[in-house]
Swiss-Prot record:
It is found in: Secreted. SUPFAM superfamilies: Zn-dependent exopeptidases. Extracellular aminopeptidase that allows assimilation of proteinaceous substrates. GO terms for biological process: proteolysis. This is Leucine aminopeptidase 1. Keywords: Aminopeptidase, Disulfide bond, Glycoprotein, Hydrolase, Metal-binding, Protease, Secreted, Signal, Zinc, Zymogen. Monomer.
Length: 387
């Protein structure tokens, strides 16, 4: 995730780097990149610039959002706060008894175990060998969840979506009676902005927290025999994107292909950073889910608010993250309705991201459980919605 608030890290990149590098663990065989290679980034709708990879990381250190459109230059669809798609979402929760029963099966222990392992990889940088290894581990976990639920016998699948940079994205698909599809997303990659190819990037919050949150929601959702057996009206997909930190590269590739295939995507919810609440508490704010209200679909965002109200023990607070702050941007770019949830209001989110100090010890698994509940509620209600 890209935080628009000025990071405490960026006093000036060079001065901070001198202080930080000695404390960072090094990777034995860093990948070497071509210093002069240029990338076309978009910093706002139709505002583009050619930059080197090092310049990309410098922008991120300064809290500047962008999407890398080097390989995906198709004209975008740019929703504003007041725009809404033609999709009509439920105005009330229709499956409270079923969803509440499923949320009781969600556990913090699963998320903590998974996140401990996920953060043990030196880095999940999308061009690194350990980024491939972490993706492989995650793929195997998703596959196990599907197989153990019995959903594989009814057509549920998990696939690797290959990319040129090495780390693949992951797509779990739970078919319904129609091809109308609801997508739940998080990004699996991490980054250390000082030296991405070399330094450790545990990425516990960004976005290890979102990754294990939606994985736990998948576990819970597949406890429903109706869903697992493919009897829900609509199809549900869970996505774990590669290369979000590079400019939403993985999610762009996926939604570009979906657009070419004329896939009927009715909703996409991104969760990026779901575990840090201390910033909000320190600021005198209540623990709550942060819901983006800029560059998202208005109708879907209202539905998301209703889900939080119905199924979570915390409320929500509206917030803004600017253009291109996470992978929901890619869904919007190709005309699909998207929404975005995070751990708090943006000014109170985790400032340790993109360093070696983005660690589990700062996170609240109680809060992550609330995000898992909203994910499960969102998925189940829309699995049975009449679109």
């Amino acid at each position: 995730m890209k935080i628009r608030a000025a990071l405490a890290l960026s006093a000036t990149a060079s001065g901070v780097l001198a202080a930080v590098v000695p404390q960072q663990a090094l990777l034995n065989n860093p990948q070497i990149h071509h210093e002069n290679e240029k990338y076309l980034i978009e910093l706002a709708p139709y505002q583009t610039r050619w930059v080197t990879e090092e310049e990309k990381w410098a922008l991120k250190l300064d809290g500047v959002n962008f999407i890398d459109i080097t390989e995906e230059r198709n004209p975008g669809f740019y929703p504003t706060l007041h725009q809404a798609s033609n999709v009509r979402y439920p105005t009330k929760m229709e499956h409270v008894e079923e969803v509440v029963g499923l949320t009781h099966r969600l556990t913090k222990a699963n998320m903590e175990r998974d996140l401990e392992k996920f953060t043990s990889f030196h880095t999940r940088y999308y061009k690194s060998q350990t980024g491939i290894e972490s993706a492989t581990w995650l793929y195997n976990q998703v596959q196990t969840v599907i197989e153990q639920s019995g959903a594989a016998e009814h057509g549920a699948t998990v696939d690797r979506f290959a990319h040129s940079w090495g780390q693949f994205s992951i797509i779990a698909r739970i078919p319904g009676k129609s091809n109308k599809t609801v997508v739940l997303g998080a990004h699996q990659d991490s980054i250390n902005l000082f030296l991405p190819s070399i330094l450790a990037a545990p990425g516990a919050d960004d976005d290890g927290s979102g990754t294990v949150t939606i994985l736990e929601a998948l576990r819970g959702l597949l406890q429903s025999d109706t869903v697992a057996q493919g009897k829900a009206p609509n199809t549900i997909e869970f996505h774990w994107y590669s290369a979000e930190e590079g400019g939403m590269l993985g999610s762009q590739a996926i939604f570009s292909q979906y657009k070419q295939e004329r896939r009927d995507i009715k909703a996409m919810l991104q969760q990026d950073m779901t575990g840090y609440v201390q910033g909000a508490l320190n600021a005198g704010r209540k623990e709550a889910v942060g819901i983006m209200i800029d560059y998202v679909d208005r109708g879907l965002t209202q539905f998301l608010k209703d889900v939080v109200t119905a199924y979570c023990n915390v409320g929500y607070l509206e917030t803004k993250c600017g253009y291109a702050c996470s992978d929901h941007t890619s869904a919007s770019k190709y005309g699909y309705p998207s929404a975005m949830a995070t751990e708090a209001e943006m000014e109170n989110t985790n400032k340790r991201i993109h360093t070696t100090d983005d660690r589990i010890k700062y996170l609240s698994f109680d809060h992550m459980l609330e995000h898992a509940k909203l994910t499960l509620g969102f998925a189940y209600e829309l699995a049975f919605a009449s679109f």
